Amino acid sequence: MGLLLPFALTFDALHPMPSPKNFGLIGAAGFVAPRHMKAIVDTGNKLVAALDPNDSVGIIDSYAPNAAFFTEFERFDRHAEKLRHMGDEHRLHYVSICSPNYLHDAHCRFALRIGADAICEKPLVLNPWNVDALQELEEETGQRIWNVLQLRLHPAVIALKERIDAESPGKRHQVDLTYITPRGKWYDVSWKGDPSKSGGVASNIGIHFFDMLMWVFGNVQHSTVLRNEPRSMKGELVLDKADVKWDLSVQASDIPSGHTGAYRSLRLDGEPFDFSEGFGDLHTRVYENALLGDGFSLQDVTPSIVLAQSLRKARS
């Protein structure tokens, strides 16, 4: 996809903004859901229905207090079908998906089957063959699945990619990635601690970094897993233009001495690469592009899914 101007600048008097679109949201109580709610409102659209089995969703009041809310999928489905029969003014045009990882593809199928596009959090799916099934459904329905790969829209990452693309062929870089985000005992009991539901550490906390690195430095030529444990993974990647050492963990004991909370470090050829600022509106940018039909496609997201699945299955 190309780089786009902010949504408000892509329309003018001769090409006015289209009428607001209706959004449904699945996973309204999740930690990332407020970013989606904000993006829906910031792009001039309406959240009209939301779903989550947990009812701690007071955040909805900040964005769409009149949105219908459901704790059961069947009732949400019934409501969406009712809206569909009420005509284009009322139907869901998009469904935002923030549910647990292992439910993403099912909820994407729901969106497409009711005539809506899906905007799905990462990872889209846990296994590459599930992407093939979604591709077939896109072709059958004419609807699209747009993926949240917001790091590709970060100004610092875009500038890095432009720099790497302009270099002479054959030049290689050394990349060191460490990301440690401590999680308590609850993590092991929740769906996030079950690799069959979350995809494990590689999918759950690493996939957006893997996607970014492959977008900037090219395809995977070889990968090695040095540690593969329920709470931590470590390995090396040989990409087209870089050799990458990566270390991912949710174990508090892995935090370097002197640091508290989450620890993230990305070093390029020994120098720190800072992209800690500028995250605030990236989900809104993802929505802007999806609304213009130029979002991140199934083809864009597939390489990182293939990599994460292979890392999960590898023996250290």
Question: What role is predicted for each listed range?
Answer:
Residues 2-68:
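N-terminal Rossmann-like dinucleotide-binding module
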Residues 3-19, 82-86, 94-96, 288-316:
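C-terminal helix-rich "cap/oligomerization" subdomain common to oxidoreductases
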Residues 248-316:
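C-terminal active-site/capping subdomain that shapes the small-molecule cofactor and substrate pocket
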Residues 102, 125-185:
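A contiguous active-site-proximal alpha/beta segment in oxidoreductase catalytic domains
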Residues 69-119, 123-135:
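Beta-loop-alpha module in the N-terminal Rossmann-like domain of NAD(P)-dependent dehydrogenases
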Residues 26-27, 51, 98, 148, ...:
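Short hydrophobic segments within beta-strands
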Residues 185-254, 299-306:
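Rossmann-like dinucleotide-binding domain that binds NAD(P)(H)
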